[in-house]
């Protein structure tokens, strides 16, 4: 039995975009994939980082990672929209084989597991 591959799309937004607009971009691209028939597994904003080299006269960019399932048709739809957007300065989609990534745990969202008590010996 073969596992269905999943895809990871990393895209970089212009650094001068307001925070509200960044959130709308995250929602926009996730919704495009869902409408095209993909299952979105994870949508992570990696934050503003310095670029290795200038892209379109920008030295920084806002990195976003999007993991999704699908038959591959959705990738073309997503990349077409990103190509036409002035806010996306670079994007890359990679097909991943193998098991799906473990769900990410956001720090502070779950209480810490209790630590097992160790017996202290006194001599």
UniProtKB/Swiss-Prot annotation:
Recorded name of the encoding gene: rpsF
Give the CC-aspect GO terms: cytoplasm; ribonucleoprotein complex; ribosome
What is the organism field in this record? Synechococcus sp. (strain WH7803)
Any idea what this protein is called?
Small ribosomal subunit protein bS6
Mention one GO biological process in which this protein takes part, according to its record. Answer: translation
Alphabetized, the UniProt keywords read: Ribonucleoprotein, Ribosomal protein, RNA-binding, rRNA-binding
Q: Which InterPro entries does UniProt cross-reference here?
A: Ribosomal_bS6 (IPR000529), Ribosomal_bS6_CS (IPR020815), Ribosomal_bS6_sf (IPR035980), Ribosomal_S6_plastid/chlpt (IPR020814), Transl_elong_EF1B/ribsomal_bS6 (IPR014717)
The protein's GO terms of the molecular function aspect are: small ribosomal subunit rRNA binding; structural constituent of ribosome
Q: Where is this region: Disordered?
A: 99-123
Q: What does this protein do?
A: Binds together with bS18 to 16S ribosomal RNA.
What family does this belong to?
A: Belongs to the bacterial ribosomal protein bS6 family.
